[in-house]
Amino acid sequence: FGDSVFGNYHDFASIPGVIGALTKAAPHNLAVGGSSATQISAGDKSFPSAVQHFLSGDNASLSEGKKLCFIINYGLNDYFTGYTVEDYEKGLQAGVQSLQEAYPDAEILIVSPNFIISFEYGTAHNNDFGEILADYVAAAEAVAGEQKVDFLNANEVLQWNAQNAAGYLVDAIHPNEEGRFLLGVAIIKALEEVLP
């Protein structure tokens, strides 16, 4: 589940594609460009709505004989749109709780939003509360702790910053092919640490 960072690409060079190619996983990319964790109304493009849509389908075959893992990556559109960190947290919590109730044995990994060049390197204030991208990263980590799921701080692992990020981003926001590969590998390593 995620936004355009995961959803803009659906081939082997996508982040889920990298994960599938380097492991025995069978990824299902449920990310949607322009989506957020924040839910404004039922049936919108938010994470809670995406989870409800997913749970309403026939997913019995997904976990047959396999370990089910949900990778969640939201936050950039919440920040860009100016949704509050509080509403972002509520959306993440609602989606994660629904997945936990439906699949209590599944592994859940929340991946933080990646470093960006736009919006003054994520330091521009897009709402009346002066919240910056780092606040959404911290909120994602807090939700992971509260829900007792795993968390990957993409910024800490990848070490993208103002000096090197242009080499990993295609448009100041979305990872390029190398960036997607590196993020996919980071997710694999994070899952390997928690999976038997």
Segments the model singles out, each with a brief description of its role:
Residues Y103-E107:
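A short helix->loop->beta-strand "cap" motif at the edges of active sites that frequently abuts
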